[in-house]
């Protein structure tokens, strides 16, 4: 049996026809459209747009909005029936039925799947689901290409000193098994083997076996996650034994480690005697896998069907335009081929200060200060410390940089060129949102949405308690699949949502539902440790294929324009010649439309998690991160290859590039668990509290939560959760105004522990943790988007300091509450030891701001506070903490540890805190159109997406409108 399904293209590129509704208002005149867009353009920003004749930015039809967004691709409907009469579908180079026969399926399942392949409603989605998880992810060879590159540039003698736990000169293992790691190396990885694919096929078959859940004739606009309806519960009960059985098979292929241990606990919960257990992990993982399979079936089919629908719509419009206005069509194609493109790169843990220091080690004190503090902090023995990280970082390269510098042409060549050519486009200090944690900051960077308010992400931390649902979330585990659903429920719009009329590509980033082509974030995270360069290889392979198609497309556009000019010159009396040429042009336009969908994207989003991921386990300044064999040079290698693809494709001149990090990282020398300190303090007072810990310690394994039957928090006195070593969040429930209301400072000072007895919980934490605690932050008043007051409590020189930050009507005040002079917890008067000393002009400006903002009761604007804090060790601290509790789910008390301490961690790298090394995030823009007159100053990392959006669309971005939480800085780039 041969399934009729996909493509004539050998590289897996599909061509699919489909219905298109509401394509094009045929009465609309092309030249009128161009004129109207030109008028709109003249009313745009005065910055970049003012010099428009020098910027290949004007795509008057394709990007004017009216044509592409409102007419051409409006109303596209994606249906399964589209693909019923297609060519042969193949997976792994063989027909779908032949591939199914190779999988380790049980005999009844294999027979049933083979028999059902004749049903297109069953087989076509299955084929594209498998294409997503096999061909797309197996297209590249699983070799460490960065390693190969290094060995081609260095001799083994040159590279030998920079070997470390992530890089060895020994020959690589050729298969996909886990590499051997040291006992305290807590990295986790998984492999994409046939057993896993078989499990996914088995789940798919059971879901579709009775046609209870099928795609039908029209794909849904949004995925509906499983709930507690009778139908959903029956489906879960039917699938769960299958899932547990398949997990049992899969566990056998995993090495010993946290991943395997977690799966074995799930199998235990699958036993009949545990069926009624609260937070049953077998049911939890069943729900997660069903949602994962169904969600990715939909994604895979949407990504298969959409390009063909778009191509058909584009072809139909061009053929209609040919008939009505051939010259206008030619002008359109000329403009369209020069349309703007954008590349958005998000790198976990990328710090501007560190990168600038590495490309120019002698330009400032950064690296010397890191090494000097390491020498001091590593030798301290704090009385309150409970231990040290399990791994001691190897920092040989850091020492060489400080002692001798480096003149290695193969070390960070891309970043060196970037700082040399485009330094003004790189912010002097990128600002990470507090707490400086990825789950909070990544959606900010990717979408430009704020955390709170309409259109916000609604995700304040790596964990939170939703009091309205009586539900705790922790996103290292299966709750990660809930992130998109949670953000969407708050109205967050991704760049893919906003640009769904453009050609888009996602490489390894979450929040990708509307991406036209996507490489899954969770797959990359799961496989990228065991198979280095896994996601990067596949993304670059896809782009390389598209670059070749782009060059072919540009040749096709030129050829079609020549034919259009000939057609336009041809007299009306040459009727048959015109008809013949028009028929030929219609065929060429159809081919051009198909080719355009295979060419380079208008918008590309790339996410790279590895600099942060390994910095936690190895240390932020370890050889594993900063050496020539480390993660930052690996990142540099892939950025260089990406740059080359865009240059080879011929579209570099019209491409705006933007890159941001979500935070930096700081080293940990001493570890402490605040809940253990709390328990000892309560025991001494004869008090017991019911405490629920919802997070893993940094370096531990994931947690599984049953979304349909999570543990209730009613009756719990305190919920605790830690984040990345640098933030510790507590939720209390003792407000006089109800369980769902966040308690204020005064309520926490009289926390009832038993009849007639109360504790001052703020003082308890501040006093017991004073050696390790930088400060804690608690609500002084209720917080809204319009106003808030927070109290900071910490110790300095043995004295408790109580300080308050309040904001009202755009004015922020920061003051001491103990009448002991100016506030000092945020160290605004101090200089930043990692940066060059302030000039006389800067010192004068800082003194004026100190007097203005701290010397009077009037307060300052957010911009003034930002300018002041930029000249201190804690960038933007006042503004960030003033907005810490904009989101009600941001906890009751947040603890931030001192430099060198890590709360609830086993590893030597931390973030989520308030120190410069954690707050300093990279954000920068470059490209041939970027020519800022002066360097960008302190800038939120959330400005990345709005700037690229404005460049692509010409639309103004207004903070607070249309879901934007951060401003565009496009006008500052020219």
For each feature predicted by the language model, list its residue ranges.
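His/Asp/Glu-rich, glycine-adjacent segments
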Residues: 119-123, 127-128, 132-135, 141, ...
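N-terminal secretory signal peptides that target proteins for export/translocation
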Residues: 1-25
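Secreted, luminal/periplasmic, and some membrane-associated catalytic domains
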Residues: 58, 62, 66-69, 93-96, ...
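Low-complexity, glycine/alanine/valine/leucine- and proline-rich hydrophobic stretches
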Residues: 898-935
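A long, amphipathic alpha-helix that forms part
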Residues: 301, 315-317, 321-330, 337, ...
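Bacterial N-terminal signal peptides
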Residues: 32-42
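Boundary at the C-terminal end of the N-terminal hydrophobic targeting segment
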Residues: 48-50
């Amino acid at each position: 049996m041969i399934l009729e399904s996909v493509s004539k293209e050998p590289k897996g590129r599909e061509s699919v026809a489909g219905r298109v509704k509401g394509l094009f208002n045929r009465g609309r005149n092309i030249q009128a459209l161009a004129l109207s867009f030109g008028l709109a353009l003249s009313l745009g920003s005065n910055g970049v747009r003012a010099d428009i004749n020098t910027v290949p930015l004007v795509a008057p039809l394709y990007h004017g909005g009216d044509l592409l967004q409102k007419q051409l691709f409006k109303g596209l409907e994606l249906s399964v029936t589209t693909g019923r009469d297609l060519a042969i579908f193949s997976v792994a180079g063989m027909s779908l039925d032949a591939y199914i026969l190779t999988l380790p399926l049980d005999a009844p399942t294999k027979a049933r799947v083979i028999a059902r392949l004749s049903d297109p409603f069953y087989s076509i989605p299955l084929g594209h689901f498998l294409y997503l998880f096999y061909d797309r992810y197996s297209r590249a060879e699983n070799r460490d290409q960065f390693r190969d590159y290094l060995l081609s540039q260095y001799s083994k003698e040159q590279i030998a000193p920079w070997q470390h736990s992530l890089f060895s000169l020994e020959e690589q293992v050729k298969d996909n098994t886990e590499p051997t790691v040291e006992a305290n190396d807590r990295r986790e990885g998984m492999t994409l083997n046939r057993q896993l694919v078989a499990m996914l096929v088995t789940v798919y078959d059971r879901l579709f076996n009775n046609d209870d859940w099928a795609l039908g004739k029209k794909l849904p606009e949004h995925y509906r996650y499983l709930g507690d309806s009778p139908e959903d519960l029956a489906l879960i009960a039917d699938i769960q034994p299958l899932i547990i059985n398949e997990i049992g098979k899969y566990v056998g292929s995993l090495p010993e480690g946290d991943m395997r241990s977690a799966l074995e606990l799930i199998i235990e919960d699958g036993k009949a005697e545990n069926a009624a257990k609260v937070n049953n992990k077998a049911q939890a993982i069943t729900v997660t896998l069903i949602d994962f399979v169904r969600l990715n079936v939909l994604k895979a089919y949407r990504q298969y069907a959409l390009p063909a629908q778009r191509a058909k719509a584009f072809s139909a419009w061009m053929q209609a335009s040919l008939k009505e206005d051939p010259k206008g069509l030619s002008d359109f194609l000329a403009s369209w081929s020069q349309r703007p493109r954008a590349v958005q790169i998000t790198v976990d843990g990328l710090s501007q200060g560190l990168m600038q220091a590495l490309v120019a080690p002698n330009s400032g004190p950064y690296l010397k200060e890191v090494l000097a503090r390491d020498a001091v902090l590593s030798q301290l023995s704090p009385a309150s410390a409970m231990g040290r990280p399990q791994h001691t970082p190897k920092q040989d390269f850091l020492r060489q940089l400080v002692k001798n510098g480096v003149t290695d042409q193969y070390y960070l060549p891309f970043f060196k060129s970037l700082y040399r050519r485009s330094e003004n486009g790189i912010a002097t200090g990128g600002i990470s949102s507090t707490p400086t944690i990825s789950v909070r900051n990544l959606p900010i960077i990717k979408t430009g949405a704020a955390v709170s308010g309409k259109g916000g992400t609604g995700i304040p931390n790596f964990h939170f308690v939703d009091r309205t649902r009586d539900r705790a979330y922790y996103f290292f585990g299966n709750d990660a699949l809930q992130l998109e659903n949670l953000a969407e429920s708050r109205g967050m719009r991704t760049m893919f949502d906003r640009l769904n009329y453009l050609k888009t590509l996602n490489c390894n980033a979450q929040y990708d539902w509307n991406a036209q082509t996507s490489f899954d974030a969770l797959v990359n995270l799961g496989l990228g440790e065991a198979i280095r360069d896994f996601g990067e290889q596949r993304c670059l392979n896809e782009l390389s294929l598209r670059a070749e198609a782009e060059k072919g497309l540009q040749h096709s556009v030129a050829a079609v324009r020549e034919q259009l000019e000939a057609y336009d010159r041809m007299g009306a009396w040459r009727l048959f010649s015109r008809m013949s040429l028009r028929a030929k042009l219609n065929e060429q336009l159809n081919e051009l439309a198909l080719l355009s969908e295979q060419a380079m994207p208008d918008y590309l989003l790339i996410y790279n998690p590895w600099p942060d991921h390994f910095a936690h386990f190895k240390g932020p300044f370890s050889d594993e991160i900063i050496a020539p064999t480390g993660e930052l040079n690996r990142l540099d290698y892939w950025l260089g290859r990406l740059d080359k693809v865009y240059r080879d494709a011929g579209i570099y001149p019209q491409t705006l590039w933007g890159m941001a990090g979500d935070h930096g990282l700081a080293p940990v020398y001493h570890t402490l668990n605040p809940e253990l300190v709390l328990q000892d303090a309560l025991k001494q007072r004869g008090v017991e509290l019911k405490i629920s810990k919802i997070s893993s310690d940094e370096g531990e394994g994931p947690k599984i939560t049953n979304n349909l039957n999570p543990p209730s928090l009613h009756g719990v006195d305190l919920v605790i959760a830690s984040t990345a070593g640098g933030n510790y969040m507590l939720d209390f429930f003792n407000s006089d105004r109800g369980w769902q209301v966040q308690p204020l400072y005064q309520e926490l000072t009289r926390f009832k522990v038993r009849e007639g007895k109360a504790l001052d919980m703020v003082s308890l934490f501040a006093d017991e943790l004073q050696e390790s605690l930088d400060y804690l932050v608690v609500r002084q008043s209720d917080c809204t988007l319009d106003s808030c007051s927070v109290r900071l409590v910490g110790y300095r020189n043995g004295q408790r300091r109580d300080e308050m930050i309040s904001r009202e009507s755009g004015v922020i005040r920061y003051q001491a509450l103990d009448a002991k002079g100016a506030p000092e917890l945020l160290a605004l008067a101090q200089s930043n030891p990692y940066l060059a000393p302030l000039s006389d002009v800067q010192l004068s400006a800082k003194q004026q701001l100190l007097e203005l903002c701290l010397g009077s009761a009037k307060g300052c604007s957010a911009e003034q506070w930002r300018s002041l804090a930029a000249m201190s060790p804690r960038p933007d601290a006042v503004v960030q903490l003033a907005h810490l509790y904009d989101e009600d789910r941001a906890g009751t008390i947040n603890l931030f540890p001192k430099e060198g301490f890590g709360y609830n961690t086993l590893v030597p790298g931390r973030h989520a805190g308030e120190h410069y090394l954690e707050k300093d995030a990279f954000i920068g823009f470059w490209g041939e159109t970027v020519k800022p007159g002066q360097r960008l100053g302190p800038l939120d990392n959330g400005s990345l997406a709005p700037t690229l959006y404005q460049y692509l669309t010409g639309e103004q971005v207004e903070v607070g409108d249309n879901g934007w939480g951060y401003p565009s800085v496009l006008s500052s780039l020219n």
